[in-house]
């Protein structure tokens, strides 16, 4: 999928290109393109983490009468909350880059997107340990 930018340049919005990092040598100049690349990395890294946690919960609670349903609900709510936060923080990072007049390399988008998921994990575990 391609979108037309305000300066009549083409913005690449291909999920396959973002996830495979095909865009070596190119830079992300547009706010939409920066946001999209950062958000997709945050989305798929969060999906991986929540998928692994969901499988673990499902296996550990398979004999529990309501455990399977509770694990699906918990993973769904956690995933939706992290994706909502990723939308906002990805837009903030892209906006800061755009206002500063900087371009973003595709690898920087990877670092920002996966970094959001790692930071979410660290904050989540620190909150759980504080309640024990």
From Swiss-Prot:
Keywords: Cell membrane, Glycoprotein, Membrane, Transmembrane, Transmembrane helix. Its main location: membrane. The gene is Tmem170b. It is found in: Cell membrane. It comes from Rattus norvegicus (Rat). Interacts with CTNNB1. InterPro entries: Transmembrane_pr_170. It holds the Pfam family Tmemb_170. Residues 1-37, 90-104 are extracellular. Glycans are attached at residue 12. Residues 59-68, 126-132 are cytoplasmic. One of its GO terms (biological process) is negative regulation of canonical Wnt signaling pathway. This is Transmembrane protein 170B. It comes from the Eukaryota. GO terms for cellular component: plasma membrane.
């Amino acid at each position: 999928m391609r979108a037309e930018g305000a300066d009549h340049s083409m913005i690449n919005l291909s999920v396959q290109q973002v996830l495979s990092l095909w865009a070596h040598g190119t830079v992300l100049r547009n706010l939409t393109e920066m946001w999209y690349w950062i958000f997709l990395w945050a989305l798929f890294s969060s999906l991986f983490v929540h998928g692994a946690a969901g499988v673990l919960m499902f296996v550990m609670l398979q004999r529990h009468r309501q455990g399977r349903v509770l694990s699906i609900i918990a993973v769904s709510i956690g995933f939706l909350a992290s994706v909502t936060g990723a939308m906002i923080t990805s837009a903030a990072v892209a906006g800061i880059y755009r206002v500063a007049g900087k371009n973003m390399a595709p690898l920087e988008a990877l670092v920002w997107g996966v970094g959001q998921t790692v930071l979410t994990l660290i904050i989540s575990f620190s909150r759980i340990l504080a309640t024990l």
